[in-house]
A protein has these predicted regions:
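Phosphate-/polyanion-interacting regions in eukaryotic proteins
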Residues: 1-52
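Catalytic binding pocket for nucleotide-activated donors in carbohydrate/polymer assembly enzymes
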Residues: 54-180
């Protein structure tokens, strides 16, 4: 679905156990410009029904909040035609979140500015589309399964080498890697 045809609302579904998520919900639950809900099994004043990815992608804005570690919706949300709204990212995975640039790959939010950010992008859809395009370009490099496989082999080789589980000489290493790539 094209960005222009989506609902002018921010969406979030996820478990709300952590202090930072609770503070976010205290600030924004029940506001008209966002539909956020706690989908955990625990009793909660923020309880809402689960929404799958397809349902969430009907909204112009997808909120991505870290939980105990990385925000698990970040990758698929950045590959959608919705604008990702996220606080400063602190966790790092294979996706190299530390290289993501706020307001270039996603729109930076906090517990005070969500209204302003949403209003800005509703009024300036070209700004949103530019960030969405940048996000798509970033995600694209992770979609090449063959390349990701070879990078994984190289990472494992380095891990085994530096942990003392693999003894390599350069010629032997090159030969073995070339054999794997065939």
């Amino acid at each position: 679905m094209k960005y222009e045809n989506k609902k002018d609302i921010a969406i979030f579904r996820g478990a709300v156990y952590q202090k930072h998520r609770k503070e976010f919900f205290d600030s924004y639950f029940g506001r008209t410009f966002c539909d956020i809900g706690d989908t955990s099994k625990q009793p909660s004043q923020w309880k809402k029904n689960f929404l799958n990815k397809k349902e969430q992608m009907k909204y112009k804005f997808i909120i991505s909040l870290e939980g105990n570690d990385v925000a698990s919706n970040l990758k698929w949300a950045m590959n959608s035609n919705s604008l990702v709204l996220a606080p400063k990212i602190t966790c790092e995975t294979w996706f190299m979140e530390g290289t993501l640039k706020p307001n270039y790959h996603f729109a930076l939010i906090d517990n005070d500015n969500l209204t302003t950010v949403i209003e800005h992008f509703i009024s300036h859809p070209k700004d949103a589309l530019e960030i969405i395009n940048n996000a798509h370009q970033y995600v694209k490099k992770f979609l090449d399964k063959k390349k990701e496989f070879y990078i994984g082999i190289l990472v494992l080789t380095k891990y085994f080498y530096y942990s003392g589980q693999l003894d390599l000489n350069k010629d032997e290493c090159k030969r073995e890697i070339l054999e794997l790539i065939k």
